[in-house]
Amino acid sequence: MAQLEGAGVLRNALLSALNVAAGTSGEPTAVGKQEVRRILVVELWNIGDVVLLLPFLTQLRKSFPRASVTLLARPHARVLLEGTGLVDEFLDDAAPAENWLSLNPLLGGWRDLWRLRRQLRSRHFDLAFQCRLHVREHVILAMSGARRRIGYAFGEGDRMLTDALEVGDPHRHKVDDWLRLLSVVDATPDDVFTKLAVSPDESAAAAEVLRLRGVSDGDVVIGIHPGASLPEKRWPTERFAEVAAELASRPGVQVVAFADPAGIGAELHDVPGVIGLSTSLRELMALIERCTLLICNDSGPMHIAGGLGVQTVAVFGSGVARWFAPLGDRHELVSAGSAQLAGGIDRVTTESVLQAVDRSLAITAARGK
């Protein structure tokens, strides 16, 4: 118990020291809409998390059309958001999360922290936003020196914000978490968002890749991506193969199986009638855009499809669909019940996924697309 209390004291002392070093005040500063010239947004997580930023970034553009928006994120954000016009400047951050989690100075990473502080301070931000319940992001907002630093209340890190919103509804979708932050600056969000952008050249290259592999105009193109960031989010690859084999046997259907950078999904390339592809992130986006439907796990590709307006059949395991469902309403989310039960994703059957595919295709046919 004494050790735990000591760790808590050290953590609080470090947070206090960081806040003092940041030179920030916890009091909100009045910033009129017309005064806002530079905005910082922090999202240091995965591909899907960046895609779920689209509605927030869209509303930020509408509310502050003359402001420059800087996104502090991992390098994939720059690739994903290329061509959307939603971000004026990308700052890449690759600081190890473990160092930030512990706030232990013996683990290193402090030189990177101060380098980042200099980068952010030099931009003189008026507003800064983040919506993680994570001390790392609170520290970054404090280090930015932004006049208004907006996020959610989270333990001792609250002192680093000028506007700390109560978390409130625990069932809220991640998109709504972001949009709710705009209430602090009197912005009223709507349901319209800018989609991910694929250039004409990228689209033409994707079409040619498919044409060379026998895909014709009028074919129903079904993509399958069996990868995911965590093992507990991955439906067994052999069941994806069963789905692929069934769909590939149907007249007028072309199945395209994508392998992820780690090679997950490469086994599907051996399924008779399946087109197997390994791609870059931008190539994957262009190919998904040409699909009628993407079958996948709760993963980055699922969110990419949602960000492109492509319907999905997504298998959920440890993730919670009501928090992390893809953008849009053209999706079938398949799970075996409680995400808390061990082996939940393994209980999802091949038949249930095929039924979801048939429902999605029926809706597409009824809509004429």
Task: Locate predicted features.
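Catalytic machinery of carbohydrate-active enzymes
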Residues: 1-369
